[in-house]
């Protein structure tokens, strides 16, 4: 093989070698925040294939929902900052606000991070009782003095709390007993201790209501006004409602937020970009990182961070709400996925499966399709390009 053919063959093989060097957008998506546009005013829509996703695989989400009559009300997939897949069911539309249930908890986590960034709160090691100096606490236990903000964020306060272990209709269910109380924060602080703080994970919506109280006590804002000024307005969430609990005159911050699905996606996209939005650091990247780490094994399939959930063996994390409200953030794939729904507790909850089986595989298969195209093109060049070289050699030989 002469020099010309060797050079041409090398030029054809090099693209193949480069193509198989593992490259990920995860670090870029979480740190630099460099985007060609920001969906503050409007999301742009683009075909999945333009962002390396296989539309045939994505469409299996719709097939599964419709053929099995799954009570999903909306699905959004955002890739590279563009909506590449969006479906609505059961008369829901993109313009309608939907209950997000306990996804509200992840918004509360973000607001705690912002309150720390803004200097209203020192850090997550601050003691909870320091924010309620005028409260008289029932069932006093010195261990209550050791409950910190971090213990509330990770649901490891040690307070005795019965929410998911007994029916919601049971008068002893603490969630609804709290909603019936004249002061939700007082109700939670009055609960007896069951474990040392940090020793045990137990699902506790009451701790999230205390986080709202901490923000209001520390900032002087109502939780709604604080969220609007420091979180919603900067990322373009201009339509929302928040459940006002009549008995206490307080806002339900463990599950009372209502948002449009596209605004849920904005929140996920903020986290995907490391807290940055259009050159503004809305939440510190440090908070995004620390709050989405997993600190507790919940005893089920999921692990738990600062109100965010994770699945062992996967790099995505999710905000989760009752009846299948979900916000998934997939840093490695540069993707956000949103679901709203009305799935009863006793039914199959399919959204984790949809993300793992369809969304991630759509990205993987889209990438494989790109590889095949490059391989085929490169092989074509290997075959075709040497021909002129051979002709040139013969002409001047």
Mark where each language-model region is:
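Active-site SXXK
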Residues: 81, 98-124, 152, 211-215, ...
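Active-site Gly/Thr loop motif
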Residues: 238, 288-336
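Short, charged, amphipathic alpha-helices and their helix-cap/turn boundaries
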Residues: 82-87, 129-130, 166-197, 221-240
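Secretory targeting signatures
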Residues: 1-31, 366-397
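A short, well-structured edge-of-sheet supersecondary motif
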Residues: 62-92, 327, 334-338
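Active-site-proximal alpha-helical segments within enzyme catalytic domains
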Residues: 207-214, 255-276, 325-341
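Structured C-terminal helix/loop/strand segments within mature extracytoplasmic catalytic/sensor domains
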Residues: 316, 321-367
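Active-site helix/loop module of the DD-peptidase/beta-lactamase fold
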Residues: 118-159, 190, 218-254, 259
């Amino acid at each position: 093989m002469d020099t010309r053919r060797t050079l041409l063959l090398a030029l054809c093989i090099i693209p193949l070698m480069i193509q198989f060097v593992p490259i990920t957008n995860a670090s870029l998506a979480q740190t630099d925040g460099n985007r060609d546009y920001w969906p503050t005013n409007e999301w742009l829509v683009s075909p999945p294939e333009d962002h390396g996703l296989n539309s045939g695989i994505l469409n299996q989400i719709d097939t599964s929902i419709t053929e099995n009559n799954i009570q999903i009300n909306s699905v959004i997939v955002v890739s590279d900052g563009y909506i590449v897949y969006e479906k609505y069911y059961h008369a829901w539309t993109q313009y309608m606000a939907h209950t997000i249930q306990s996804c509200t908890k992840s918004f509360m986590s973000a607001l705690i991070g912002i309150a720390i960034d803004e200097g209203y709160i020192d850090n997550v090691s601050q003691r909870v009782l320091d924010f309620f100096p005028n409260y008289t606490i029932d069932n006093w236990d010195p261990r209550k003095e050791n409950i910190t903000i971090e213990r509330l964020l990770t649901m490891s306060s040690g307070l005795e709390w019965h929410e998911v272990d007994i029916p919601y209709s049971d008068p002893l269910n603490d969630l609804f007993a709290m909603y019936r109380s004249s002061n939700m924060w007082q109700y939670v602080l009055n609960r007896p201790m069951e474990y040392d703080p940090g020793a045990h994970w137990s699902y506790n919506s009451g701790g999230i209501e205390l986080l709202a109280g901490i923000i209001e006590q520390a900032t002087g804002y109502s939780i709604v006004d604080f969220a609007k000024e420091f979180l919603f307005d900067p990322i373009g969430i201009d339509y929302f409602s928040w459940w006002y609990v009549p008995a206490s005159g307080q806002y339900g911050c463990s599950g009372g937020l209502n948002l449009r699905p596209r605004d849920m996606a904005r929140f996920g996209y903020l986290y995907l970009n490391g807290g940055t939005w259009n050159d503004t650091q809305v939440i510190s990247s440090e908070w995004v990182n620390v709050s989405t780490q997993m600190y507790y094994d919940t005893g089920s399939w999921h692990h738990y961070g600062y109100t965010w959930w994770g699945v062992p063996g996967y790099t995505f994390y999710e905000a989760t709400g009752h009846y299948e409200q979900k916000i998934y953030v997939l840093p490695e794939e540069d993707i956000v996925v949103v679901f709203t729904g009305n799935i009863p507790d006793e039914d199959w909850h399919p959204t984790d499966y949809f993300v793992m089986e369809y969304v991630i595989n759509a990205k993987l298969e889209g990438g494989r399709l790109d590889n095949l195209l490059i391989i085929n093109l490169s092989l074509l060049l290997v075959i075709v390009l040497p021909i002129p070289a051979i002709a040139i050699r013969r002409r001047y030989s």
